[in-house]
Curated annotation (Swiss-Prot):
Cystine connections: 32-43, 35-52, 39-51
Transmembrane parts of this sequence: none
Keywords linked to the UniProt accession: Cleavage on pair of basic residues, Disulfide bond, Secreted, Signal
Protein name: Trissin
GO cellular component, one term: extracellular space
Signal peptide: 1-29
Amino acid sequence: MTKTTMHWLAHFQIILLCIWLMCPPSSQAIKCDTCGKECASACGTKHFRTCCFNYLRKRSDPDALRQSSNRRLIDFILLQGRALFTQELRERRHNGTLMDLGLNTYYP
């Protein structure tokens, strides 16, 4: 092997090692029964996050957030922010403070 080939091979191995170290082990993933029996059937789907969010919100237990991984905690926070934003939009539409113009205004 040439010196250049060995150099690139070493870089490639270092990159693979970094990728392997960055991948979280499966033991850190949230378990299907963490969010109650009603969410277990939705495990592995997009609906599971929503179900889990609602379950944790109902429980209002601070320890429930500590049990989830950091990634799930970020998801929880983003879902909570989205829910508050959606609720605010709904209230603005209900109060008439948000103009909801349909496409019919522009395309008769």
